[in-house]
């Protein structure tokens, strides 16, 4: 995990605003939102701890890296991977794999 991703996860965990380079975290009462290059890529619901993942319109390596860093911190059994230009999300707990859809909640 990259240093910026560790700092991003720490800001989310402690519900603090954070900005470094291309990554911004905004903490609100109901959620903590993550932005990459100004595009909304994730939200953590502070009440239910549900994590909503988005690609922000960009299926870049950096977007996938940020989303995987979030998953590693908040849903460690899940991971996003790519096969033949198609993104999937897998869950090691039950061995499932499904198509990654921007806006999905885990």
Across the structure, where does each feature detected by a protein language model lie?
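Terminal leader/tail segments of proteins
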Residues: 1-106
């Amino acid at each position: 995990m990259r240093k910026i991703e560790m700092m991003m996860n720490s800001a989310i965990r402690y519900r603090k605003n954070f900005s470094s380079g291309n990554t911004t975290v905004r903490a609100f009462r109901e959620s903590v939102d993550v932005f990459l290059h100004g595009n909304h890529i994730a939200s953590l619901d502070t009440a239910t701890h549900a994590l909503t993942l988005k690609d922000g319109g960009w299926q870049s390596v950096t977007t996938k890296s940020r989303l995987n860093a979030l998953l590693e911190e908040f849903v460690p059994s899940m991971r996003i991977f790519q096969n033949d230009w198609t993104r999937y999300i897998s869950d090691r707990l039950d061995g499932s794999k499904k198509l990654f859809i921007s806006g999905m909640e885990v």
